A protein has these predicted regions:
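Feature captures the catalytic cores and cofactor-binding loops of soluble hydro-lyases/lyases
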Residues: 1-100, 114-147, 151-165
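C-terminal binding/interaction regions
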Residues: 104
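Channel- or pocket-lining gating/hinge segments that regulate access to a cavity or pore
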Residues: 109-112
Length: 165
């Protein structure tokens, strides 16, 4: 079918480092991707899959060991409610605007989209925040209260700066 061919074309176009983001209009009762297409996408270099819809074969996909975020699991095929018609275009997934080239960062708590135009700035601030948090964690492990350390107060900034050297 036309939809199946479009889906194949999209998956076969995956390149190293791609995150597949699927706008499924929050529909939870039709799988957007199953284990075979997920396996193929990861083999081609995809580093994650995100959909605001459902996945099929979620146990098998989880065993692939790659980051996958989805609203639901459902055994029915995507053709029941979805028809892929384009790729590499701006979409809205789970209410978030996503453009090709945006940076997507995820962990066990979820995923965030960073617009490509500000990705370098956000990365620099995130690195600085991680450094401040490392200081806070070290101090709290040593028995201190987080007050003034997290978030870092002006009174504790000299301690942080000495620790940073």
């Amino acid at each position: 079918s036309a939809g199946q061919n479009a889906k194949r074309s999209i998956v076969e176009g995956v390149t190293n480092g791609d995150v597949i983001v699927i706008e499924a209009r929050d529909v939870p009762d039709a799988g957007t991707v199953g284990d075979i297409y997920a396996l193929r996408a990861f083999h081609l270099g995809a580093v994650g899959i995100i959909t605001d819809g459902a996945l099929r074969d979620t146990e098998a996909i989880a065993e692939l060991g790659k980051p996958v975020y989805h609203r639901a699991s459902h055994g029915s095929t995507w053709g029941r409610r979805h028809m892929p018609f384009s790729h590499d275009e701006p979409i809205t997934c789970a209410g978030v605007f996503v453009e090709p080239g945006d940076v997507i960062v995820g962990d066990t708590d979820g995923a965030v989209v960073i617009p490509h135009a500000i990705a370098a700035e956000v990365a620099a601030e995130a690195e600085a925040q991680e450094h401040r948090e490392a200081f806070a964690i070290e101090r709290v492990r040593a028995g201190e209260s987080p007050q003034g350390i997290f978030p870092l107060s002006e009174e504790r900034r000299p301690d942080y700066e000495a620790w940073s050297k």
